[in-house]
Amino acid sequence: MKLLEPITINGLSVPNRVAVPAMVTRLSGEDGFINQNVIDRYVRYAEGHVGLIVVEAMAVHHSKSGPLLRISDDSFVPGLTNLARRIHDTSNSKVVPQIIHFLKVARSGWRQTVDMLSLEDIDRIVEEFGDAVARARQAGFDGAELHSAHAYTLASFLSRTNTRQDEYGGKTLEGRLRLIGRVIQNARAKAGKDFPVGVRFDADEFIKDGYTVNDAKVIALRLAQIGVDYLSLSVGGKFEDAVHLQGQVPYPYTGYSGDRAMPGDWYPPVTHAHFSAEIKAYVKANGYETPVATAGKLSNPDDAERLVASGQVDIVAIARGLLADPDWPKKIRNGERDRVIQCDYCNVCKHLDGTHNRVICSLWPQGSLQAPADDPAAKAPQWGSNGANLTATAGKGKITLKWTKAPGAARYDVCRADPMGQLRLEDAVKVTRWEDSNVLAGTRYRYYVRAYTATGQGSSPSNTVFVELPPPDYMTSTMRAEDSVAN
């Protein structure tokens, strides 16, 4: 598979094209230092042979923000060094920290915006980023990634909503690009041109008056022109449309743009790859071979391979899918695709982040703070002597499935096929009952269930049930009228 072939980024050989993008874990303390829980989270990705591990955003400054990692002074270097060393000792995975600057927000809903920053503030931000990238090199990381996506400072300067009136102002593209350009220049000067530096930014902001892929293509070209070593594309995640809950700090993933940043199960798969492909094609047409990473509901290996093999993107960044199963790359390489624990995009992880709780996956065993260690020798669950005894009842606009418990099962995957024969994983649950409310009356559906261990060994499929939701009364009366006309 092309997906599992190495890629070189500014001299750095990354063993495969699977990346885990930065995801907040909320495992650190308020002090921002690396602790054992943080190390354990990222070592699991290395155990699964993820090609490029991007450590969650760590701040270049000391502003209060809750449990967020820091790289704002030299006191953080020993802990960061230990993290990088532990990952390198585990496998040949490469690791970079994502480096962030954020503006102030308050529980009242007030937030600082880029027009409130003085030129001295901007100069300080430039220096802080450069110093942080230099510390990343000192700590033994393989590179660094600048966070210029979503709701944060670098992204806010890039946005068309930037209302500054000076040389950093949003009225011109060059004004919006000035800060990120200076940051990269300073990082190169302090960390060296041979130290890989990537940038994560939005392909589309998905807010009123925000920029779209048309701007993102030009932003990407400028980043390539000034020597950025890889481009990682996200979308949305803005404060402008965030839903503010009384007494809580605004969370930029609660509005529509936040949904687009972390699309739930109601969104189609491969949600944003077309943006990344368009941006890569534009950059390449202008003479640059800068690697491009995409993200957005990409945990299906066939989708990931298609994007990379076709040259649409160079790297596939899988966030929630690798949180659910850090061993995803290893299992795919070993021909154990059936053992991959498929993310069902329930977004429990997103909810935990938004409520300032430690981020885990709902598919892990109850009470687990980390994904369970892989156990290839574990035995698959077995249905009892009477099988799964899967039953389905239809009524009140939904179909209800029930089945018997399989000893040794950590979860059950519910699969559904429509009349066209398209089969998909609908959900993964820990109980023996499930409701499907997204069904069309008068359509015949087919369901089955499989039981899985915590490390992905699957049972044989349950018995298959076929069920049809009765048509609503308005539909039956219409059908009778049509029959009368026909007769």
Question: What are these model-predicted stretches?
Answer:
Residues 102-104, 204, 408, 419, ...:
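Short coil/turn motifs at secondary-structure junctions
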Residues 377-408, 441, 454-487:
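Pro/Thr/Ser/Gly-rich low-complexity, intrinsically disordered linker/stalk tracts
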Residues 413-442, 454-461:
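Recognizes extended acidic, P/S/T-rich segments that occur
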